[in-house]
Amino acid sequence: MRTLTAHGQAWRLLAAVVACILIFHSPLIFNPGYLSHDELQWAYQATQHQGSAFVNGLWSDVHAFQYRPLTFSLWMLISRQCFDHPFAFHAIIVAAGALNAGLLSIAVFRAGAGVRASFAAGLLFGLGPYATYVHGWVAIIADLIWVFCTLVIALATMRNRHRWLTWIVSLVLTSIALLAKESAVVIPALLALAWFFSGRQRAWAEATVFAAIPVIAYLSIRLQTILMGAPSGSPYAWHLSIIPSNWLKYQLYPVAIDKFGTEGVRALLPIVIVWGLMLLALWRVHIRYVLALLLFGIAALGPVLIVHPAAWYGYGYSAVTAAVVALAWTHMKRWGHVAVSLFACIGFLHSVNLMRIIHDAGEKQSRFSPALAEAVKKSHGSPVVLSVKNEKDRWIYIRMTHDIPSYDGVKMGENVKLAEGSEAANYQVQEDGSLKPLP
């Protein structure tokens, strides 16, 4: 009876977390456009590929720098069906993220946290800045997949009714995650830490071993490409010297209400204090929670610590942060609750700001891209040179014109450029993304 009650409680947790995230992230669902060039490029690729989206050369190209055949094939499939219906596309992405958050809440509940703390963990993860960025940009399907696979492995291991089932789930889902994104190489490390902090339970050790098998095979084939294949000057070029600064950025980003990676984070000292208070709250409960946060965090970030930081890279890290904080919550004193709540509230404000930015970019894209296609069509092969009325929005249009072969059947490519300095333009991009012809 107790097991049945816990099982029902887990399903209710899942439903509640998913519902809350779908509601709070509805501005991301009802975004009429897209954030960046990736979506436009893959919409074009989807029209060029003939036959099934999953039958392509991506699967055999194991030495491609970004070997993500599952991600790119799935993206192609969804683009074919939903690119012209942005609400549907965004709904799929947000729903997938909401499911991940719900699964995390179940995992935390099964690990021993109370119902309320488990529910809060799901929201802290699913409504945090990292998840908000992932939910708002359809290009981040890969992170949704590998984190989903990791959570399902964790849940199967915790349930552990049949050892052989845990072995199969760990082996198969780690393999699937690796086909989605190279970040999945961290899965065995996360499982090994779960083994250590769970009192060295055998199920976690077995899950670690079976998850490690595909990772070892994957790295034996792809390690050289991953380490040496990044073009010089690209954001994927790696440097060991940036590990400390990157690590700190990922810690502080949730409470830094600003664009990720900008020079000089606003009010750095208060941000560090808020983060430090949360860390102190964990320390006062027990040092093992601080160690768990640090070790799980480093493992979840793993290889991204050596490359240029980006908000979506912290998606897995935010999941383990939410889990550790929730497990410590019931043992905290009141001031600890205040410290963690302050961290969570500032993070939520950051998420609201991100939603505003992402939705604004989508609204502009929904007007800009069709207007640009029409302008190119009217130009009869002459270049379309654009100036931007509000230079603060220039980053949006740099993305929206970057390496876009075609839009809605109209060839773009070299026919479109943004004016530099005093260069003459024949169109000006207005505040709302529409185009105004210039004399």
Question: How should each PLM-predicted stretch be described?
Answer:
Residues 2-439:
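Polytopic membrane enzymes that build or remodel cell-surface glycoconjugates and lipids
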